[in-house]
């Protein structure tokens, strides 16, 4: 059996030009939005990078350029579905995924189960294979000042 591990990280800053945020494919009511070329889903972006990293295929920016207008405001679930195809082509399966959302606000806990279900559906895996947790920075740094959100994701693949 062959194992591969990948790590992904993403961060987006808040903008008053939008309202509500999308994290893990779930829309969350908030008075600000996330500045991004796509929908700004930091969790899916980090997950894409983790899977691509484990496969040795670079990162999300290599495959979906942020200068390409076809990806302007696109739903990030599209990226994850495309990367699932790459995973299948390489004949790897997901053992587990562990995600950490770092945000002072809004609170993520009420939305985590919906996020897990959304990601499991796209990746065609069991919800039990995905862990999502959220933490704050105790009001330190740009996240603590509620200027943005960051996410780390680790995934383990096998074949």
Swiss-Prot record:
It catalyses: 4-CDP-2-C-methyl-D-erythritol 2-phosphate = 2-C-methyl-D-erythritol 2,4-cyclic diphosphate + CMP. InterPro entries: MECDP_synthase, MECDP_synthase_CS, MECDP_synthase_sf. Signal peptide: none annotated. Pathway: Isoprenoid biosynthesis; isopentenyl diphosphate biosynthesis via DXP pathway; isopentenyl diphosphate from 1-deoxy-D-xylulose 5-phosphate: step 4/6. GO terms for molecular function: 2-C-methyl-D-erythritol 2,4-cyclodiphosphate synthase activity; metal ion binding. Its EC number is 4.6.1.12. GO terms for biological process: isopentenyl diphosphate biosynthetic process, methylerythritol 4-phosphate pathway; terpenoid biosynthetic process. Coiled coil: none annotated. Keywords: Isoprene biosynthesis, Lyase, Metal-binding. It holds the Pfam family YgbB. Binds 1 divalent metal cation per subunit. It is an enzyme of class 4 (lyase). SUPFAM superfamilies: IpsF-like. Its cofactor is a divalent metal cation. A divalent metal cation binds at residues 10, 12, 45. The record marks 37, 136 as: Transition state stabilizer. PROSITE patterns: ISPF. Homotrimer. Belongs to the IspF family. Involved in the biosynthesis of isopentenyl diphosphate (IPP) and dimethylallyl diphosphate (DMAPP), two major building blocks of isoprenoid compounds. Catalyzes the conversion of 4-diphosphocytidyl-2-C-methyl-D-erythritol 2-phosphate (CDP-ME2P) to 2-C-methyl-D-erythritol 2,4-cyclodiphosphate (ME-CPP) with a corresponding release of cytidine 5-monophosphate (CMP). This is 2-C-methyl-D-erythritol 2,4-cyclodiphosphate synthase. It comes from Francisella tularensis subsp. holarctica (strain LVS).
